[in-house]
Regions:
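Bacterial lipoprotein signal-peptidase II cleavage site
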Residues: 17-28
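GH16 jelly-roll
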Residues: 37-312
Length: 312
């Protein structure tokens, strides 16, 4: 997976997350942060940041403006997998806790690098790979681990904020992910969760969503005893009218976390999903009436998810 990241906050916070190509933008409603109204199609225009060429798709509202946040990163620098330099000013090359990922995933720090204007997450399975136990429901299987990467922001974000990634998902059965998670792992907002492979049926007959879908969702959890809520309506698996195969190019995918009970999702500058109110944000009252209210880390990773791996 390759990506860039943009973060804006209202009056505010805004993150731009992008990948290995020109990507995100930031600014006020009609232009860049300083209020200019540049033409994205004008090749003569010079931009301070790659995301300046795109208007922010969300109105800041009367008397408000979007402010670019320092966690935003267009990845226009080089960071070797074993010597990350500038990358470490904003990111940690691992998960936000001491966890190596959902088996058979094993996150490795040296599978993260930055080059050619993109954050790059690689995947490998060497001959001497560790064998791990994978469990999904009542199924259990021993299988080779999958080495890949995960990064976590050093700055947390909270509403009102617009976070946008300019990303190209991997051609893989693995998940390409951009998401936000509270430090206690009880509140989560998924910006991108997508599977780029054409393989949509497992060896056990389990059917998967394919490369024409992007999962736009959120979770609230109780950790003990474990309970997990997320919306299951068809709109959470976005498919556009053209049947776009999302792995074929870079796309901008963002979420406007307006407040604890309102989320808006944007794809290539167009709002494609809105979830609003307790009945869809937290119908089981796991948050005790507070909704999605906690500060969150931004996490970018790939995962060989247990349920999919065990299906074969």
């Amino acid at each position: 997976m390759e990506l860039k990241l943009l973060l804006l906050s209202l009056g505010f916070l805004f993150i731009s997350c992008s990948s290995c190509m020109p990507g995100d933008n930031n600014g006020e409603e009609n232009g860049s942060e300083n209020g200019s109204n540049t033409d994205p199609g004008d090749s003569e225009t010079e931009f301070e940041y790659e995301w300046d060429k795109f208007p922010v798709p969300v109105s800041a509202g009367t008397g408000m403006k979007w402010e670019l946040q320092s966690q935003s990163d267009d990845f226009n620098y080089t960071a070797d997998s074993n010597n990350k330099g500038n990358f470490e000013k904003k990111w940690t090359d691992y998960y936000h806790a001491n966890w190596s990922g959902p088996a058979p995933t094993i996150w490795q720090r040296d599978h993260i690098s930055v080059s050619d204007g993109c954050l790059r997450i690689e995947t490998s399975r060497p001959d001497d790979v560790k064998i791990v136990k994978v469990t999904s429901g009542d199924k259990e299987k021993m299988m080779p681990g999958t080495y890949t990467g995960c990064v976590t922001s050093k700055t947390r974000v909270v509403y009102p904020v617009y976070v946008e990634a300019y990303a190209k998902i991997a051609n893989s059965t693995m998940a390409s992910d951009v998401w936000m998670l509270s430090p206690d792992d009880t509140q989560e907002i998924d910006i991108i969760e997508a599977y780029g492979s054409d393989r949509v049926v497992g060896d056990d007959g389990h059917k998967f969503y394919g490369p024409d879908r992007i999962h736009l969702s959120h979770h609230v959890f109780i950790r003990d005893p474990f309970q997990d809520y997320q919306p299951t309506d068809p709109g959470s698996w976005y498919k556009d009218v053209n049947g776009t195969i999302w792995r074929n190019d870079f796309h901008r995918v963002g979420v406007y976390w307006k407040d604890p009970f309102n989320l808006e999702y944007y794809v290539d500058g167009k709002m494609v999903r809105r979830v609003s109110g307790k009945n869809i944000i937290d119908p089981n009252d796991f948050t005790k009436g507070t909704g999605l209210s906690k500060e969150m880390d931004i996490i970018i990773n790939m995962e060989d998810q247990s349920w999919r791996a065990i299906s074969g």
